[in-house]
Amino acid sequence: MYKKQSGFSLVELVIVIVVVGLLAVAALPRFLDVTDEAKKASIEGVAGGYATGILSARAQWEAKARPSVVVGAERYNTVNYDGVDFWLTRSQDSSGADTDFRDGYPVALNSDNASFPSSLSDQNCIDLMENLLQNPPAVDTVSNASSNSNIKYSAQADGGNWTCTYVQQEGKSAHQFVYEVKTGRVTVTLQ
C-alpha cells in the first residue's frame, strides 16, 4: 500500500518565513510606539496619584483646623494623613517673615514632633512617594535604582530648590515628574 505524505515543501516553508518576517518588520515600529505610549501613561498615572496624595494631605490639614507643633521657638505645620504624620510647609516663620513657601504641603515624615527638616534629602522624597500613594511603585535613590531592576522610579532631592524629581526606570526612559515642595505643584516631563 502506498501512503501519500502531506505537509509543507521546503519552498513553501521559506515563503512562509519570509512573509512572517516582513509582517514582523512592519509591525515592530507600531509595537514599540504602543510600548512608549504605555510608559507615558504609566508615569502620568503615578504623578496624578502623587498629586492627589499631596492635595489630600493638605485637605486633611485644613479639615483638622491647620494643626501645628512648636519646636524650639518655631511653630511648624503637621498633619496625620492616612495614619502617617507629615511635616508640612509654612508661609511664614514665627516672627512673621515670609518663607517663600505656600502653607500646608508635605515636606517629610514627622516621626518625633521635634525635628523639622532643614533641607530636603533623597530619603525624604522616597518617604513621600511611599506614604502618599496607596500602592506606590518601588522607589529608591538614583544609585540604587541603577543596580536594581525591581526599582521602578529613582528619587532625587534638590535641597536648594526644595524639589523631588522622580525618574521612571522602566525601559530606561527619561520620563519624570517633579514635586515642588514650595508650591505643591507636580509637573510631568515626557521625553
Predicted regions and their residues:
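Secretome/extracellular-domain signature
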Residues: 66-77
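Membrane-proximal N-terminal amphipathic helix
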Residues: 38-67
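C-terminal or internal capping secondary-structure element at the end of a domain, subdomain, or sheet
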Residues: 13, 20, 26, 53-58, ...
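Intrinsically disordered, low-complexity regions enriched in Pro/Ser/Thr/Gly and acidic residues
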Residues: 75-191
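N-terminal single-pass transmembrane signal-anchor helix
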Residues: 2-42
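Alpha-helical interaction segments
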Residues: 20-21, 40-41, 51, 76-77, ...
